[in-house]
Amino acid sequence: MQGHLSVWLVKHGLVHRSLGFDYQGIETLQIKPEDWHSIAVILYVYGYNYLRSQCAYDVAPGGLLASVYHLTRIEYGVDQPEEVCIKVFAPRSNPRIPSVFWVWKSADFQERESYDMLGISYDNHPRLKRILMPESWIGWPLRKDYIAPNFYEIQDAH
């Protein structure tokens, strides 16, 4: 079933896939990485002027990585603003997604955290570097196939 925004995107020839609605009735759409930046700009102009959150997750061991954006259409005098959830999937072998920092500045630290934990590279992000882990850290801790390094030495009980 297509929601209001999906119908609008189809009407304007914008490629996407409807993933239905979440438990709160928020429409969820899948956008290809190569289409994401242009659609993000269009959504901003259309009124989705607030990036409420951005996160990422590992879909399955050895599978795709997903970057998730929760957008809100803030308007004066509207008590229940429209919301949409956008999912952009990238291959684990080369996880590259265009940054939306230049559309929504609040994407800054959120995209950096997704990079730091899952290794998704956000193209054209002005400061894409680790934010939680030390720069010397090897690997991406939230990937399902991540093997944690052995930090703890067995200490002598004496």
Curated annotation (Swiss-Prot):
One of the GO biological process terms: photosynthesis, light reaction
Domain of life the protein comes from: Eukaryota
Enzyme class: translocase
Secretion signal span: none
EC numbers: 7.1.1.-
Keyword Transferase found: no
Membrane topology: Peripheral membrane protein
Xref: InterPro entries: NADH_DH_suC, NADH_quin_OxRdtase_su_C/D-like, NADH_UbQ_OxRdtase_30kDa_su, NADH_UbQ_OxRdtase_CS
One cellular component (GO) term of this entry: chloroplast thylakoid membrane
Molecular function as annotated in GO: NADH dehydrogenase (ubiquinone) activity; quinone binding
UniProt xrefs under SUPFAM superfamilies: Nqo5-like
Reactions that this protein is recorded to catalyse: a plastoquinone + NADH + (n+1) H(+)(in) = a plastoquinol + NAD(+) + n H(+)(out); a plastoquinone + NADPH + (n+1) H(+)(in) = a plastoquinol + NADP(+) + n H(+)(out)
Location in or out of the cell: Plastid, Chloroplast thylakoid membrane
Keywords, comma-separated and alphabetical: Chloroplast, Membrane, NAD, NADP, Plastid, Plastoquinone, Quinone, Thylakoid, Translocase, Transport
UniProt subunit comment: NDH is composed of at least 16 different subunits, 5 of which are encoded in the nucleus.
Stored NCBIfam families: PRK12494.1
Record function comment: NDH shuttles electrons from NAD(P)H:plastoquinone, via FMN and iron-sulfur (Fe-S) centers, to quinones in the photosynthetic chain and possibly in a chloroplast respiratory chain. The immediate electron acceptor for the enzyme in this species is believed to be plastoquinone. Couples the redox reaction to proton translocation, and thus conserves the redox energy in a proton gradient.
HAMAP family in the cross-refs: NDH1_NuoC
Stated family: Belongs to the complex I 30 kDa subunit family.
Protein name, entry field: NAD(P)H-quinone oxidoreductase subunit J, chloroplastic
Species, as recorded: Carica papaya (Papaya)
Gene for this chain: ndhJ
